[in-house]
Amino acid sequence: MAEENNARTLTGKVVSDKMDKSVVVQIERRVRHPIYDKYVKRSTKLHAHDEANQARVGDTVSIEECRPISKLKAWTLVEVVEQAKG
């Protein structure tokens, strides 16, 4: 029987690639303020495993949740959706 992949997938922008086989991805979301009814940008930074060191700063990437790889890394790079210009 085939196992289903129920892992969460997120898309974000690479903000750091200084580590070996690791990147930091910033995920932005919009949240409605409960009092002012205005939508505010909120962001989360996640450390992701990049086995091939293919992501660069500014790239838009897709990451997937996985088993904990280290103290900070529990996500892995799936693909580079869009490369940074320049």
Curated annotation (Swiss-Prot):
Q: Which Pfam families match?
A: Ribosomal_S17
Q: Which UniProt keywords apply?
A: Ribonucleoprotein, Ribosomal protein, RNA-binding, rRNA-binding
| SUPFAM superfamilies per record | Nucleic acid-binding proteins
GO MF annotation: an example: rRNA binding
Query: Which biological process annotations from GO are given for this protein?
Result: translation
Query: Which cystines does this chain contain?
Result: none
Extract the InterPro entries matched here.
NA-bd_OB-fold, Ribosomal_uS17, Ribosomal_uS17_bact/chlr, Ribosomal_uS17_CS
Task: List cellular component terms (GO).
Answer: cytosolic small ribosomal subunit
- The residues the entry assigns to the signal sequence are none
Query: What Gene3D superfamilies does the annotation carry?
Result: Nucleic acid-binding proteins
Q: What does this protein do?
A: One of the primary rRNA binding proteins, it binds specifically to the 5'-end of 16S ribosomal RNA.
| Family designation | Belongs to the universal ribosomal protein uS17 family.
NCBIfam families according to UniProt: PRK05610.1 (NF004123), uS17_bact (TIGR03635)
Outline the subunit composition.
Part of the 30S ribosomal subunit.
For this entry, the protein name equals Small ribosomal subunit protein uS17
Question: Which gene name does the record give?
Answer: rpsQ
